[in-house]
Structure formats: structure tokens, C-alpha cells
């Protein structure tokens, strides 16, 4: 019975996530088409709603080509590792009060640890491919993710100081009177920029810069290997936006403390906020040119890192001065 309940819990996390990832790709193509005054995918199904299924089926039935010079075992394991790590993080994300697989007291630390492991899948795929383009993309990715994780860690300290807990549910409940995005708005902007870089999204998509690296670390992958990298990237995007919703936008809490707003399911509020942040990802991708690699590193180490550290001192000072520590 325990194994059955465990399996049901895992399926209830994974299936909605996979559907969300599939339709996130469609939403991205539709929104970018609207911004660029195109139609976007509209052939498969009504308004192109079956396009993700067609894409998934196409990748599933394609032949997996293994490069003759590649390290085959690591080459196959790398995309699986990337995808699994993107899924494991979801077990501590609360979609509503009590709607979480594992409500651990060190949820923030757990997410940081898992996200830092994600770089291994990418760097091993670049190395195992035995291709200079793939390896260069993997090295860029490793440096980029490590650089911005430092800033993310320091930014999270500010939220932890205001909430007094590493537990995601308690962080959300600490925002019942006011969402943290209002007093910590500059920190939210820094965090949003950092998660764009952490998820390798435009304008920080240096590891897979199509124009210069022919798709980057996954250049040698086809069929399901490519699909797993793709799914992992989009699952990470949704995860980071969900994390931002929890840390700054009050998680599943409605925007105003009105009884009528509590009639709406908490999952709906959570989904709306996450969708809004995901739209920001797509909008930024459509609007901004790609950074040069030296600009990316300078932004991470010389601007975001000192600023996030300064904010830790400032927030600590304010909370201690006014005796506001939770």
C-alpha cells in the first residue's frame, strides 16, 4: 500500500508537470509569433493545440544517433540525469496549503542543492559528445550556472531574514499581510535576472547560442536524448518561476485579504502568478539581444554579487534596528 500511495503521489506530480512543459513550448511559440506579428503553429489541431503532441511523437519515433567517437554510457546518461534532477526538485514545492509531496524544513536548501547538481548533466553531455562545439557550450554553462548560483543564494538570504524559515509553506504564510515583492522589489528584479541566467534563457542563453555554437552542449543529440534536455530546460523554467511565486508573490495566497477571493482554489492563484512570470521569460526572449560572454560574467560577479551582498547587510540592519526579526 505504501508503494502504491508513493507511486500515485509521484504520478500526480510528474504528469501535470509534463503537460505544463509541453504546452509551455506551444505558449512560447504563440506569444513570440504574436510579438513578431506572425501566426505561429496553427495547423495541428484547433489553433495548433495538438502541436506539442505532434512534436513529442516526432522526437519519440526518430532514430537515436550515437556519435562513433562519443563515450556512449555517459552520453546516454547525461540527458536522463538533467531531466530527473528537474523533476526531483518539485517534491518540495507547495501548490497550496498542505498540497506538497514533502514539506521539509530545509526546502530552500534542498532546491539550491538540486539546482547546483543540474550542471553535471550538461557538462558531462558536452564532454561525452567528443565535439568541440558541445564541450564549449558545456563549459560556458558550468561557469554561468556557478556564477549566478552565488547571487541566488545571497538573494535568498534576504527572503529568509524576512520570513525566519527555510520551509516554503512558512515563507508563504509569512506573506499574509504583505507580499515580499513590495518591500523587496529591487531584490526581486535581481532574483529574476539571476534565474534567467541560471536556466540558460535569453538574453543569457550563451551555452546554446545557435548562431555561434550550433545549439551548444546538445548539438550531438537527437530523438529522445534531445527531448529530455528540452523537457529538463522547460521544467527548470517552470520550477524557477514557481520558486519566485513562493518567495515574492505569496505563493497560493490571493492578492487581497477578501473572503470572496478565498473561494477560488489556491492552486489557481499559484498557477496564475507562475504563468505571469513565465510570460516574462518569453517576452524577454523576444525583446533582448544575447549578451556577450564577458558581459554575462561581469554582470554576475561585478554587479549582481556585490549588490545582493549589500542588500543582505541593509535588510539585516533594518530588521535589527526596528526589532522586526521574525
UniProtKB/Swiss-Prot annotation:
It is a multi-pass membrane protein. Signal peptide: none annotated. It catalyses: a ubiquinone + NADH + 5 H(+)(in) = a ubiquinol + NAD(+) + 4 H(+)(out). Its main location: mitochondrion. The keyword Acetylation does not apply. PROSITE patterns: COMPLEX1_ND1_1, COMPLEX1_ND1_2. Keywords: Electron transport, Membrane, Mitochondrion, Mitochondrion inner membrane, NAD, Respiratory chain, Translocase, Transmembrane, Transmembrane helix, Transport, Ubiquinone. Its EC number is 7.1.1.2. The chain crosses the membrane at residues 1-21, 41-61, 72-92, 104-124, 152-172, 177-197, 234-256, 268-288, 303-323. It comes from the Eukaryota. It is found in: Mitochondrion inner membrane. One of its GO terms (molecular function) is NADH dehydrogenase (ubiquinone) activity. GO terms for cellular component: mitochondrial inner membrane. GO terms for biological process: aerobic respiration. InterPro entries: NADH_UbQ_OxRdtase_su1/FPO, NADH_UbQ_OxRdtase_su1_CS. HAMAP family: NDH1_NuoH. PANTHER family: NADH DEHYDROGENASE SUBUNIT 1, NADH-UBIQUINONE OXIDOREDUCTASE CHAIN 1. Core subunit of the mitochondrial membrane respiratory chain NADH dehydrogenase (Complex I) that is believed to belong to the minimal assembly required for catalysis. Complex I functions in the transfer of electrons from NADH to the respiratory chain. The immediate electron acceptor for the enzyme is believed to be ubiquinone. NCBIfam families: PRK06076.1-2 (NF004741), PRK06076.1-6 (NF004745). This is NADH-ubiquinone oxidoreductase chain 1. It comes from Chondrus crispus.
Amino acid at each position: 500500500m505504501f508503494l502504491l500511495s508513493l507511486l500515485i503521489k509521484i504520478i500526480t506530480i510528474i504528469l501535470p508537470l509534463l503537460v505544463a512543459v509541453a504546452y509551455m513550448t506551444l505558449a512560447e511559440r504563440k506569444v513570440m509569433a504574436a510579438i513578431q506579428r506572425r501566426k505561429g503553429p496553427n495547423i495541428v489541431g484547433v489553433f495548433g493545440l495538438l502541436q506539442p503532441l505532434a512534436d513529442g511523437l516526432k522526437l519519440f519515433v526518430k532514430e537515436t544517433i550515437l556519435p562513433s567517437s562519443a563515450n556512449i554510457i555517459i552520453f546516454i546518461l547525461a540527458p536522463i540525469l538533467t531531466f530527473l534532477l528537474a523533476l526531483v526538485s518539485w517534491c518540495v514545492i507547495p501548490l497550496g496549503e498542505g498540497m506538497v509531496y514533502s514539506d521539509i524544513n530545509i526546502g530552500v536548501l534542498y532546491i539550491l542543492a538540486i539546482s547546483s547538481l543540474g550542471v553535471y548533466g550538461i557538462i558531462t553531455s558536452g564532454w561525452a559528445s567528443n565535439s568541440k562545439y558541445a564541450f564549449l557550450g558545456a563549459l560556458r554553462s558550468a561557469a554561468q550556472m556557478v556564477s549566478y548560483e552565488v547571487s541566488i543564494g545571497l538573494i535568498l538570504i534576504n527572503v529568509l531574514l524576512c520570513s525566519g524559515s527555510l520551509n516554503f509553506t512558512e515563507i508563504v504564510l509569512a506573506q499574509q499581510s504583505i507580499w515580499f515583492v513590495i518591500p523587496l522589489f529591487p531584490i526581486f528584479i535581481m532574483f529574476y535576472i539571476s534565474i534567467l541566467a541560471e536556466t540558460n534563457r535569453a538574453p543569457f542563453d550563451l551555452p546554446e547560442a545557435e548562431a555561434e555554437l550550433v545549439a551548444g552542449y546538445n548539438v550531438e543529440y537527437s530523438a529522445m536524448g534531445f527531448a529530455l534536455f528540452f523537457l529538463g530546460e522547460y521544467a527548470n523554467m517552470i520550477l524557477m518561476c514557481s520558486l519566485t511565486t513562493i518567495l515574492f508573490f505569496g505563493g497560493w495566497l490571493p492578492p487581497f485579504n477578501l473572503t470572496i477571493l478565498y473561494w477560488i482554489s489556491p492552486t489557481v492563484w499559484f498557477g496564475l502568478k507562475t504563468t505571469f512570470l513565465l510570460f516574462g521569460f518569453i517576452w524577454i526572449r523576444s525583446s533582448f539581444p544575447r549578451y556577450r560572454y564577458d558581459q554575462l560574467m561581469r554582470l554576475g560577479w561585478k554587479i549582481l554579487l556585490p549588490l545582493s551582498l549589500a542588500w543582505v547587510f541593509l535588510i539585516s540592519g533594518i530588521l535589527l534596528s526596528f526589532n522586526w526579526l521574525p
